[in-house]
Swiss-Prot record:
Its main location: cytoplasm. Belongs to the D-alanine--D-alanine ligase family. Its EC number is 6.3.2.4. Mg(2+) 1 binds at residues 248, 260. Mg(2+) 2 binds at residues 260, 262. HAMAP family: Dala_Dala_lig (MF_00047). Residues 99-293 form the ATP-grasp domain. This is D-alanine--D-alanine ligase. It catalyses: 2 D-alanine + ATP = D-alanyl-D-alanine + ADP + phosphate + H(+). The lineage of its organism: Bacteria, Bacillati, Bacillota, Clostridia, Eubacteriales. Cell wall formation. Disulfide bonds: none annotated. InterPro entries: ATP-grasp, ATP_grasp_subdomain_1, D-Ala_lig_Van_CS, D_ala_D_ala, Dala_Dala_lig_C, Dala_Dala_lig_N, PreATP-grasp_dom_sf. The gene is ddl.
Length: 300
């Protein structure tokens, strides 16, 4: 099978995407597929460079990659691709929309408000949420332009920074607890990972630098494990996920809260999904093969 590994892109996460793409290529080649590296520098590259491939493995992140646009283009071209479809991808990229659906479905998530201008910040609403808060681009990823703000004085500057990366900014209550991630493969939860950043929170450096954080497989207490698994499965169902997705949570006082869903989890050597799969004996090559297999089974 001729597999095009699509990477690069036009988002702030381009370098992360290129790193993911290189790793994916290296291990897909072990499976004896014909691999075509497809580096995207501008949107129209997808139409041109994807011609002739049998399957697109998406190693993209951020806008025009994780937001449903590339998925829509590939469906128009009748090229099967890895991961979730356009609707789920678009919703999960929009943190505000994701949290509204989670709240409607009675899935725990931290309180938040969204703003689209530094001149129209509702400080009273933020007071109700309670400090400290995370200020971040609504549709960003990899914790780019994400800041932990401890009082009213720091809000405007953090909002202005985040608005450089997105037209909307999320201001979310900082729920202090243990950060965990649940990797879902074909609707089943792989072993849970605890994320212990060496910095104050799991920022860009902690995510991608060697030694930026400790990510370890953990055994949750039985009742908590059940709650976490039920919540991850509820997210999968309510947001109509397919193939694979990563559900990030915080556990506070024995109660899990969903932070966000990642529909194209990173595939670098430091990435969480391969670590979780490896804990049940699934090698990186086997994981990639499963993603291809399950993706081909999805009716688009």
């Amino acid at each position: 099978m001729k597999i095009g590994v699509i990477m690069g892109g036009i988002s702030t996460e381009r370098e992360v995407s290129l790193n993911s793409g290189r790793e994916v290529i290296k291990y897909l080649e072990l499976l004896e597929h014909e691999i075509i590296p497809i580096i995207i520098d501008k949107k129209e590259d997808v139409m041109e460079k994807a011609k002739g491939i049998d399957f697109a493995f998406l190693a993209l992140h951020g806008k025009f990659g994780e937001d449903g646009t590339v998925q829509s283009v590939l469906q128009t071209l009748d090229i099967p691709y890895s991961g979730c479809g356009p609707l789920t991808s678009a919703i999960c990229m929009d943190k505000d929309m994701t949290k509204k659906i989670l709240k409607y479905a009675n899935i725990n998530t931290a309180d938040w408000v969204n703003v689209s201008s530094a001149e129209n910040i509702d400080y009273e609403a933020i007071e109700k949420i309670g400090y400290p808060v995370f200020v971040k681009p609504n549709s960003g990823g990899s914790s780019v332009a994400t800041n932990l703000v401890k009082d009213k004085e720091g809000i405007k500057e953090a909002v202005e920074l985040a608005l450089k990366y997105d037209k909307e900014v999320m201001i979310e209550n900082y729920t202090k607890g243990e950060e965990i991630t649940c990797c879902m493969l074909n609707g089943k939860m792989l072993p849970v990972l605890a994320i212990r950043p060496h910095a104050e929170f799991f920022d860009y450096t902690a995510k991608y630098a060697d030694g930026g954080s400790d990510e370890v497989v953990i055994e949750l207490e039985e009742n908590l494990h059940k709650k976490v698994e039920e919540m991850a499965l509820a997210c999968w169902k309510e947001l109509k996920c397919e193939v694979y997705v990563r559900v990030d949570m915080i556990v506070k006082d024995g109660i899990p809260y969903v932070l966000e869903l990642n529909t194209l989890p990173g595939m670098t050597k430091n990435s969480l999904f391969p670590k979780s799969a490896n804990a049940v004996g699934i090698s990186f090559a086997e994981l990639l093969n499963s993603i291809v297999k399950y993706s081909l089974e999805v009716e688009r």
